[in-house]
Amino acid sequence: MLFRSPTMVESWVEPALIMIVFALALVAGSTQLSTMVGFMTSPAVGLRVSLGLALVALVIVAIAENARVPVDNPATHLELTMVHEAMVLEYSGRHLALLELASWLKLLVYVSLIACVFTPWGIAHIRQNPGALAVGVLAYVCKLAGAGVSLAVFETTIAKMRVFRVPDFVGVALLLAFLAVLLRFVSASL
């Protein structure tokens, strides 16, 4: 079935991810990640609707891309409802461990991207003293813990959607990212 393929979900997610990066680049004035984070720490950022829409779209993309509960249930035993887990059914041992590690690392990258771009507080610079770096690492760990708790609460309070509804779910992310870009073009302050 074509809808169960993880690559199919990734192909739905990619246009939304490109629009999110485009919206962030328009707001920050650059496509460099360090410049985006630097802009987000500046007082000029303020409250912007386009950044809120981009954040919600990126969270939807992260959920779909990592095959979390509304899109896929990692703990299911029904092969017909699996998206990501159907791919790893035939693996065991170290090969399964490597696939699970890759899945965890992808989730870590998305959570780190959301935490460092949208909540850049506590980020230490290279030239600062070791105490500031320790505070930066502590802030990063706290952001990851907060994201983990938020993900756990979200997954326990929402039910898995049908496989045929996944394109609509990802389409919402694309629509929100497009609205973020459109709002940025319409008004410089949004």
What spans do the regions from the language model cover?
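Interfacial loop-to-transmembrane junctions
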Residues: L151-L176
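Transmembrane alpha-helical segments that form the membrane-embedded catalytic/substrate-channel core
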Residues: V56-V71, A145-T156
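Juxtamembrane boundary at the C-terminal end of a transmembrane helix
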Residues: A180-L190
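Juxtamembrane/interfacial segments at transmembrane-helix boundaries in multi-pass membrane proteins
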Residues: V21-G52
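Juxtamembrane inter-helical linkers in multi-pass membrane proteins
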Residues: N73-H95
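Alpha-helical transmembrane segments
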Residues: A44-E65, L133-G136
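Alpha-helical transmembrane segments of helical membrane proteins, especially in multi-pass transport
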Residues: S92-R127, Y140-A152
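Short, small-residue-biased leader/transition segments that mark boundaries at the very start
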Residues: M1-L2
